[in-house]
Structures are given as C-alpha cells and as structure tokens.
C-alpha cells in the first residue's frame, strides 16, 4: 500500500449542497466548524484540490486547503476559530499575532502563522482556547503545501519565496 497524506480543509461562506457533495466525494470528514480533514495519496497537493473545490463554491466563499504536518518541526501554524455573533475575538487575535508573522489572507476566522514557536499544537490550542470567547478553536501544524481560494482567484504558497509579499502564485 502506498503512502498517504493528511489535508485540512477550511471553508468560510454559505455551506451549499455543492460543497457538501464535494466533501463527500473526497471522503473528507468534518472536524471543526466548516472544516474537514481527509487522507489522500502521497502524490496529492493542495493547489489541485483548491482548483477542483472552487467549482463547487459560491463566488463570495473562501477556502483554504493545507497539508497537515504532525511534528513540531512544522512550517506554519493554522489557527481557526468559529464565528459566534457578538463575540469579541480581539484578545485571541492579539495572542495569535504574538506567535509570529501572520500571512495576510482574506479570512475572518482562519490564520496561517509563520512561527518559530515549537510548542506542540495541543498545548498551544489549550492556551489560545483560554482566550477564545466561545471556546471553539482549532490549532494544527501545516507544511509549505497549502493554497487558498477567495472567490474566483486561487493562490498557492510558494515555499522558495524570501519574503511574505512574494509568497504566492495565482492559478
């Protein structure tokens, strides 16, 4: 049997029948608020998954797909919280910004952080969860293989980029 790779999928927007059907076709399992995880063959990458998924999304929806990295030698942290109406996430957002450099993304509740902090994600999640007003938080490590879609425009992370501004390639 071949090697497999774990992907985390985060979605912001109206959950449509098309999105639900696409997740079912992938074999993805829900693991957080409008987030799924899926195990795929080793040769799979985030950008083609985003390209395929965007055909199933509304024009104003956003999607991030990232290859999960289960070690403390991760490339990035992926932090996601739910969006409870009226909740103040300011303290949580301040703490996330202190973890490292936040990659600018068009998401309200999803952050990718380039961090030198090698604390395990369970401990980070517990600490950040104390600052989350609704105690609904997900923290995981991800590799350099991640991409996102904002409407009709998709971008993939380019690992060789020297600075955050040159970090993406449109596809």
Indicate residue ranges for each PLM-predicted region.
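Short, charged/polar surface micro-motifs in flexible loops or helix N-caps
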Residues: 13-16, 85-86, 118-120
